[in-house]
Amino acid sequence: MHIVKRVCLLLWMKMCKFAEKRINMDFIKNRRTIRKYKQEEIPSTLLNSLLEEAFRASTMGNMQLYSVVITREPDMKAKLAPAHFNQPMVTTAPVVLTFCADFNRFSKWCKCRKAEPGYDNPISFINAASDALLVTQNFCTLAEAHGLGICYLGTTIYNPDQIVEILQLPELVMPVATITVGYPDECPAQPERLPLEGILHEEVYHNYTDQDIDRIYAAKEAMPENQHFVTINHKETLAQVFTDIRYKKADNEYMSGVLKKTLKQQGFAK
């Protein structure tokens, strides 16, 4: 038995080394959000294969606390669009995927097996949401590796109550992410990212000085398109565009209220 285990380990190591040589990471380095898609259907076999592979993501206790609702029909996309602020890609993408934190399925399994579930609480929602988001990112990476384009819609948690109603989500199921998917019909400029040293912390978190912030955000603030945003919005700094225009406190507080209400409605909060 020891010899068999050793042989299996050696084979696994060889496979990993082979895979490492073959993997081309350029698609990740060059990735960008795609909002315009060709009117070309995604084969169900491909979509199902990508989702099945995505489900290999890490999951709490191997419970797989997520479900995915696939939307293809134009009338269903039209119903979802207002919940996503009528962003055009919701209705023009061949496929819209709603990833949900789901303790409904697992809880029903428990009850069917003489076990009493206790997952109607915030910590359970966070665990299920983490599972769902890990799967979401896994799917996005796999989809892009197969030549598809994706757009991550942050609006899902802004209007979860509407999505719950439209998709008929039962108790202990909560939408946490929406992805539009299709074959790209555009090649937009790649968005900027903060420098590595602005994000990494060795051993402990090192809080930022004003000088650190100046250095980390210098390139972002110097970009012509970002300077244009400042000008057209009649603001003094790029940060003000975020705080005063794009992500305002009043909006955040209102949507937080909707989120809390929906979590309670779906059984994750008292």
Language-model-detected regions and their locations in the chain:
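Acidic, surface-exposed loops and disordered segments
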Residues: K14-K270
